[in-house]
Amino acid sequence: MYEWNEMVQLMISWIEDNLASTPTLLNMSEDLGYSPYYCTKKFHALTGMTLRNYIWMRRISRAALELRDSNARILDIAVKYQFSSQEAFTRAFVKAFHMTPAAYRRAPRPIPLAIRAEVFSPYHYHLRERIVMSEVEVKAVEVKIERIPAHKFIGTWDIASKNYGDFWRNGHNCDEISGTLDSMSHLSLPGQLGQTAGWFYQDGQKGYLYGIMVAADYDGEIPTGMECRDIPESDYLVFFHPPFDYLRTNGQVMKMVEHKAWNFDPTELGFEWNEGTLYDYQRHYPEGYGYAVLRPVKTMEESSDDIGQGSSGVSIVGDNETTA
């Protein structure tokens, strides 16, 4: 029943808000109005983890990000996330990531951070609300031009997957891949959103990719099971919908944007598609950015001068700036 999905999602939000405090199961169950027994039982059923292990992994992962991004003392970070001592924190960190906090701070490397669990989706929301798609309010899809500089793409390519759902159903571990990429978020190509999905073409067949865009001169570690490929500079047509309510309108927004992207004629703007060696990218950050599909293009000789001046009423986005 979707009611339990929603309740467990509320539990997850409650945990996220209290990672740096000392709440108890009783505190949470009282706040949410369910018994401790049902909280633990339903949480495990929907996430595949015990509450205790989930909280432990989320705390150690949040602490890892603070080690990477702040100058706070290791002891202070340990205490903040409810470890009894720096030694206890070190033991936990080694157990989770096979290296000490001090070693990680000196040389951050890709590690499998535990990501926030999500069990209440737009599907469950619409079961609850019984909203028909015609009642959903969405905005017009914008078309913009953006130049992305040469970069590297680190991730996973799967020719057997056609979309996001296919990708995770085809044996890729969402928690492991997303958590590892999250640990590399500080390396994201400036102006990009971090974890990026998209499509590639191989022998006339379309596959799906998932990873992160990093600087062209990146020479650091490549996570096990992932590849690193060089991507040249290119202009992209960006089919964009501004921020929206993920639970309420995600399906309709994605459908509209993708319909526009896959059916658009770039010659109207003096372009042609350039997907032979480049990839289509997908940006999905509903509340903070919105949703966009980016398709690489190259200018046509006969209209290159006009395009360079930003004709045809299409917005020109500067080098490496997102369209948010």
Report the location of each language-model feature.
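Short, charge-enriched, intrinsically disordered boundary segments that mark the beginning
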Residues: 1-9
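Terminal helix-turn-helix DNA-binding modules in bacterial transcription factors
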Residues: 9, 13-26, 45-81, 107-130
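The alpha-helix within a helix-turn-helix
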Residues: 29, 78, 90
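Short coil turns linking two alpha-helices in DNA-binding domains
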Residues: 33-36, 84-86
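A solvent-exposed interaction/effector surface
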Residues: 61, 87, 95-99, 109-324
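A short, basic/aromatic helix-end/turn motif that makes direct DNA contacts
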Residues: 80-84, 94
